[in-house]
Every structure is written in C-alpha cells, then in structure tokens.
C-alpha cells in the first residue's frame, strides 16, 4: 500500500515497460487507458509517458501516470488502471493508496 496525506496532490504510476512486446517494430505501446477511482479520492489527471524496463531501455508510451488528491484519513482506496495496446491486448492493474495524516 502506498501512503498519501489527505492534503497532498501526488502522482502514481503503472509501468508496463517489461510487459509490452518490444520484439516488434515499432514496439507495442499503450494507445488508450482508463483510470478508475472510488468515491472519496479524486483523479486530477492521467497521461501516458515513456517508461524504462529492467534492462534500462526506454520504451515509448509504456507507463500511465495519474495525479490524485483528497481522500479520507484512515481509508485505503483501490485504484485501477486499464490499458489497451497497439497490438490489441488489454491489461488491468491496481494500486492501493492508504490515506493517512503525515
């Protein structure tokens, strides 16, 4: 779980750089994404950026970054990110953000 203060506006990321198929030309990339947040936490914005895989290679459009604000202290929120890739694959990953006074 990732901590967040109720007053903080912070960015969190989902990195698919190791999961995307880089054996093709051009490399598979994220072409669409949806970030879903439960009531009480606010999604301020989200975007797709380049990410880095474990080999240290930059992979174009392989990471989703989302900015969150708000939340109720003592509450844990499950935030979901669904992507669609240029190869037509879909994947969903979750983050758990725990809001606490810091």
Language-model segments: residues:
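Short glycine/proline/serine/threonine-rich loop/turn segments at secondary-structure transition edges
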Residues: 24, 72-77
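Low-complexity "stalk/linker" and mucin-like segments enriched in Ser/Thr/Pro/Ala/Gly
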Residues: 38-61
């Amino acid at each position: 779980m990732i901590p967040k203060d109720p007053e903080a506006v912070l960015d969190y990321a989902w990195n698919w750089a190791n999961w995307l198929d880089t054996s093709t030309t051009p490399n598979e990339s994220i072409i669409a994404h949806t970030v879903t947040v439960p009531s009480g936490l606010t999604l301020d914005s989200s975007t797709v950026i380049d990410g880095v895989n474990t080999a240290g290679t930059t992979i174009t459009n392989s990471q989703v970054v989302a900015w969150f604000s708000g939340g109720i202290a003592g509450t844990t929120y499950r935030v979901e990110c669904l992507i669609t890739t240029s190869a037509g694959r879909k994947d969903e990953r979750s983050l758990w953000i725990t809001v606490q006074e810091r």
